[in-house]
Amino acid sequence: MPTINQLIRYGRTSVKKKTKSPALRGNPQKRGVCVRVSTMTPKKPNSALRKIARVKLSNGIEVTCYIPGEGHNLQEHSNVLVRGGRVKDLPGVRYKIIRGTLDAAGVEGRKQGRSKYGTKKPKA
């Protein structure tokens, strides 16, 4: 408990909020180039081969990104747009690739939730 004198001299220090996506440096998205595209197994109760990409961002930082949706066309040297957002069962994966922009094509045959996977409206 500070004294009145201490409060006058130093004031109260505000708690700094720690960012969940530090590599983006406060930007909503960042462009990057795929260095490696591979798969990864999730944490304990789950079992799968999750698609991930190691991406070198335009600010020089290298991050591991998740590739959402079924199937993808990404390979080494593909240009991608990266956004924040972790994958709960993949440790160390704190970013996602935005589908439907740059070299990342949208998910084929997607009918619902298309905007999240960069899929165009199907012809009726």
UniProtKB/Swiss-Prot annotation:
Residues modified as 3-methylthioaspartic acid: 89
One Pfam family it belongs to: Ribosom_S12_S23
Highest taxon of the lineage: Bacteria
SUPFAM superfamilies: Nucleic acid-binding proteins
Keywords: Methylation, Ribonucleoprotein, Ribosomal protein, RNA-binding, rRNA-binding, tRNA-binding
Xref: PROSITE patterns: RIBOSOMAL_S12
Gene Ontology molecular function, alphabetical: rRNA binding; structural constituent of ribosome; tRNA binding
Alphabetical GO biological process terms: translation
Disulfide bonds: none
Coiled coil feature spans: none
GO cellular component entries: small ribosomal subunit
InterPro entries per the UniProt record, alphabetical: NA-bd_OB-fold, Ribosomal_uS12, Ribosomal_uS12_bac
Assembly notes: Part of the 30S ribosomal subunit. Contacts proteins S8 and S17. May interact with IF1 in the 30S initiation complex.
Role: With S4 and S5 plays an important role in translational accuracy. Interacts with and stabilizes bases of the 16S rRNA that are involved in tRNA selection in the A site and with the mRNA backbone. Located at the interface of the 30S and 50S subunits, it traverses the body of the 30S subunit contacting proteins on the other side and probably holding the rRNA structure together. The combined cluster of proteins S8, S12 and S17 appears to hold together the shoulder and platform of the 30S subunit.
Family of the protein in this entry: Belongs to the universal ribosomal protein uS12 family.
Protein name: Small ribosomal subunit protein uS12
Gene responsible for this protein: rpsL
